[in-house]
Amino acid sequence: MLLLVDAGNTRIKWALVDRSAPEQTPGKWLQQGSVARAEAGTLIEAWRGFSIGRVMLSNVAGHELRGELERAVLHTLGTRPVALEWFASAAELGGVRNRYLNPTQLGADRFAAAIGAHALFPEGPLVVATCGTATTVDALSAGGEFIGGMILPGLGLMASSLAKNTAQLPQVALQSTLTQPFADNTDAAIVSGCLAAQAGAIERAVAAQMRTYPNLPIPCILAGGAADLIAPHLSIDYTRVDNLVLIGLHTVAIQHSPTC
């Protein structure tokens, strides 16, 4: 059994893959789950009883969580001699070439998501928007190169920063049911502005790719916990994909092992 783990700033997602299956398809797994970052210790129980023979993890949430994950995995493995494979960005991996000036500086989650998106849509240029604690909007070339991208505060972080750093603006509950861009009350105006900023960044990225590839379709892949809030405010076509980082990890695991 292959265990895949995506540890983000807010949640930890995981999936289990049957390594004995004759055909391996990225994103096809036996079981999956998700816990809040503070609940990392509960993963021991979630993974109990599975015969895990390989582990691949992505972690962007710091050394403390990495240690917690290591303890949880090692407790699950018991005496089985299984090495933990920590995914990290590289110059080329999983069929994607990394054009970052310093390829190792690219966040592991962004590179894994790009690999996952390319595995699902291998035929042309892409925009990959992952909407979480931070929103990242990245571009892939028609040849499968990670060109680069944008990083901006996520929807929740954007709204909370207004409440924290201004004297009279409140903390608002985020929702996507706004029907008009020009709100007639302060709470709705904050939500409208934050949603417009997120949607605008994504649409701007797609427009840039369209200028580069005027004769090709530009699929926009939308992922992350806040994607469903932002999606109704996009004026472009998009494809909603869950667990994009896990799909990227699975892609790498398949390509770098004869049995998985």
From Swiss-Prot:
Pfam families: Pan_kinase. Keywords: ATP-binding, Coenzyme A biosynthesis, Cytoplasm, Kinase, Nucleotide-binding, Potassium, Transferase. PANTHER family: TYPE III PANTOTHENATE KINASE. The keyword Nucleotide-binding applies. The active site is at 109 (proton acceptor). Its cofactor is NH4(+); K(+). GO terms for biological process: coenzyme A biosynthetic process. The gene is coaX. This is Type III pantothenate kinase.
